[in-house]
Amino acid sequence: MMGFIWFWLVAVMIVGYVVLDGFDLGVGVLHLFLVRTEAERRATLASIGPVWDGNEVWLLAGGGTLYFAFPLLYASAFSGFYLPLMIVLWLLILRGVSLELRNHIDVGVWRALLDGVFGLSSALLTIFFGAALANVLRGVPLQADGYFFLPLWTNWQPGPHPGILDWYTVIGGLLALVALTLHGALWLSIKTSGELAQRARGIVNPLWLLLAALTVVSLVATIAVRPASLNNYFSLPVTFVVPVGVIASLAGIWLLNRKAQPVKAFLSSCFYLFFMLAGACWGLYPTLLPATTGTDRDITLSRAISGPHTLAVGLVWWGFGMALAIGYVVFVYSKFRGKVDLHAGGH
C-alpha cells in the first residue's frame, strides 16, 4: 500500500512541476518570436517574473521525493542519465542567469543575446524533459546490477540498446515543446493585453492542431514501442477515463479559446497535461523504470522502495511540506492576479 501511495505522490510532484513551470517555459519559447517591441519583451518577462523561480522548486522537490521513496531508482536513473542531466542543469543555469541579468543590462546587443539564450534554453529544456519521459516509457538497457548508461544517440531506433535520442523520444520532445508553448501562449493571453495578448491568443489555434496531431502520434508510438503500457487499462477498464480526459481537455482548449475565455482555456491546458502524465504513470505502474534487456531487470516498486517505517514517517513530513508549498503557491498567485502593465514592464 505504501508503494502505491508514494508512487502517486512522486507523480503529483511531476505534474505540479509540469503544470506550473510549463507555462513559463512556454513563455520563454514564445519570447523568441512572438514579441516585437522592447515594451512587449518586458511585459512578457513580467508575466512570469514573480513565479518562475518558485515554479522550479517543484522540480527539486520531486527529485528529493524520488530519492527518499525510491533510492534504487534514483541511483540508477541519475547515473544512467548523467549526460542529459548535466545538459539540463546547464540549461537551467543559463535560463535563470539570462532572465535575471537582462534587467540589469541596458545595452541592446547584450539584451538581444540574453533574450536569445532565454528563449533557446527554454525550448531545449522542454524538448529534453519530453524526451526524458519518453525514455522512461520506452525503457533503458538495465544491466544485472541495476545500472545502465545511455549515449546521446545510437542508430535512432528504440531497440534493446537505444540512445537517449531516437525517433520515439524525439516525438516525446516535440510533443512537450508544442504542449508547453501552447500552455505559455494561454498564460500570456491571460496576463497581457493589447496586440501581444491578441497574438498570443491567435497562435493557440495552429499550436492546438499540432498538439492534437502529436498527441495521436505519440499515443500510437507508445503502444507500438511498449505494448505492455495498455495492460493496466484493460485490467481496470474504468481507468480509460484518463484518455477520455485527454480528449475532453483538448476539445476544451479549442472551444474556450475560440470563445475568448483564456482563463478557462488555460485550465483546460492544465487538465490536458495532468491527464497525459497520469496516463503515462498508470501505463508504467508498478514498474518504475522498464528494462529493454528483459522484464526480469525492470526496476519495480517492490525492488526500489524504501523501508516501511521510513515511508510512514516521511508521509507525515511530506504532508506538512506540501501544505506549506501549496499555501505559498496560493498566496503568490493570488497576489499576482490581473494583467501586467505593458509599458511599465511590471505588474
Regions of interest found by a model, annotated:
Residues M1-G54, L60-G63:
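N-terminal signal-anchor module of multipass membrane proteins
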Residues M1-V10, Y67-Y82, L137-A144, P158-W167, ...:
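Helix-coil boundary and interhelical linker segments in multi-pass alpha-helical membrane proteins
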Residues W6-Y17, F78-L92, G119-L124, G163-A179, ...:
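Alpha-helical transmembrane segments
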Residues V27-P50, Y67-A77, E100-R111, G184-I203, ...:
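Juxtamembrane membrane-water interface segments of multi-pass membrane proteins
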Residues V51-L125, Q143, S229-P237:
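Membrane-interface helix-loop-helix modules in multi-pass inner-membrane proteins
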Residues L101-A265, G279:
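Long, contiguous internal "core" modules enriched in hydrophobic/ aromatic residues
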Residues R138-F148, F274-D296:
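Juxtamembrane non-transmembrane "cap" segments at the membrane-aqueous interface
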Residues A291-A312:
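Short, membrane-exposed interhelical loops at transmembrane-helix boundaries
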